[in-house]
């Protein structure tokens, strides 16, 4: 979760940062942990079961609450530090609105649906754009098509494997645990 938190935070802010300062890594991790803690906070009972099934460790509601509130506090404090030190430039108001919107989505949707909405819309699509720029120096239609052609087989194998796993396991609770383990591995 910590590595995935860093990854999510980095992807969100990498284009907004202009430094290699070590504080950025802390900020990326804090922001990503805020995203995870909002998901965990919004679906506590399911998260407790899934974490227990995956790790055989029991996490309590109290732990999830502390994680949530401490993630809010650390992200707010570090946001001000980032702005003050001019390590990242972003619109604080826009980020607050985005976080509130995500929190509402996580509270309305199921655990999987909420995570999927975040993962696809707020993480994967911007990440694909960043990957295309990294691989081809710019984002344009030709480079997008080239990227999609090179990736489609990998994506199809992954999706087909996930469906096969779903039917082989034939246990929804176990599948959800495997699904989140799979997502953690690819992140």
What residues fall within each predicted segment?
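Hydrophobic membrane-spanning alpha-helices of multi-pass integral membrane proteins
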Residues: 149-163
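Membrane-interface helix-loop-helix junctions at boundaries between adjacent transmembrane segments
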Residues: 1-41, 49-59
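Membrane-interface helix-boundary motifs at transmembrane edges
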Residues: 14-25, 81-96, 135-144, 171
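Extracellular/periplasmic helix-loop-helix junctions in multi-pass membrane proteins
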Residues: 163-182
